[in-house]
C-alpha cells in the first residue's frame, strides 16, 4: 500500500528566472516532478502566472506542481487547466481554509498540496492533521535548516 511505503522523489523547485529553460533541464536530468514557485504573486497580491505554467507544461513531460498566488477556487482551476498536475497552497490554506476543501471536492484531493513552514508553525503536527481533514492530498514541509527536531516532526506527521 502506497501510504505505508517510504519513497523519495526528486522535485526541483523553480522560481521566475528562466523557469522554462530550467524545467527542460530538470526534465532531461530525470526529475520526477517539478515545482514552480511564484512567491512574488502572493507577496504582490497578483494572480498566479498561468502563462508560465502553460509554457512549462508544454515543454516537459513530467508533472508540474504550481505554487504561489492562489487565493480563490478560480486560481486553482486556471492552474490545473493550464496543465499543472497539482496546486500547492500556503497562505490560502492559512487565510481561507475552506478553499482547501472546495478545491479538493472539485478537483480531487490528490491534486491539492498544502505547505507547512516548520520555522513558522507552532504546532506543525496538529496543523498537518487539520490540513488532511480539510482535504489536502499531500503536504509540503518547508524548513530553513534540517535539524534533528524537524526530522522528529516529519516522522510524527508521516504517522
Question: Which residue ranges define each predicted feature?
Answer:
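Hydrophobic, well-structured mid-protein blocks that either form specific transmembrane helices
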Residues: 79-120
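Short beta->alpha connector loops at strand-helix junctions that form conserved
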Residues: 68, 89-92, 142
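Short secondary-structure transition/capping segments
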Residues: 46-49, 76-79, 99-103, 152
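Short amphipathic alpha-helical segments and helix-helix/interface helices
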Residues: 23, 53-54, 100-104, 128, ...
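Short, surface-exposed, charge-dense and proline/glycine-enriched linear segments
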Residues: 64-71, 97-99, 120-121
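Conserved N-terminal beta1-alpha1 strand-loop-helix module at the mouth
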Residues: 1-62, 73-74, 109-114, 118-149
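Catalytic cores of alpha/beta
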Residues: 57-87, 128-129, 152-159
Amino acid at each position: 500500500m502506497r501510504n505505508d511505503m517510504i519513497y523519495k522523489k526528486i522535485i526541483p523547485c523553480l522560481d521566475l528566472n528562466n523557469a522554462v529553460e530550467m524545467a527542460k533541464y530538470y526534465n532531461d536530468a530525470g526529475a520526477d516532478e517539478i515545482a514552480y514557485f511564484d512567491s512574488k504573486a502572493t507577496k504582490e497580491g497578483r494572480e498566479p502566472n498561468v502563462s508560465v505554467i502553460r509554457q512549462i507544461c508544454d515543454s516537459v513531460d513530467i508533472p508540474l506542481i504550481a505554487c504561489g498566488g492562489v487565493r480563490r477556487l478560480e486560481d486553482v482551476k486556471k492552474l490545473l487547466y493550464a496543465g499543472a498536475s497539482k496546486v500547492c497552497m500556503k497562505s490560502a490554506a492559512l487565510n481561507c481554509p475552506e478553499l482547501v476543501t472546495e478545491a479538493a471536492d472539485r478537483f480531487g484531493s490528490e491534486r491539492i498540496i498544502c505547505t507547512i513552514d516548520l520555522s513558522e508553525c507552532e504546532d506543525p503536527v496538529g496543523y498537518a492533521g487539520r490540513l488532511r481533514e480539510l482535504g489536502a492530498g499531500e503536504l509540503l514541509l518547508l524548513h530553513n535548516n534540517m535539524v534533528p527536531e524537524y526530522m522528529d516532526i516529519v516522522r510524527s506527521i508521516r504517522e
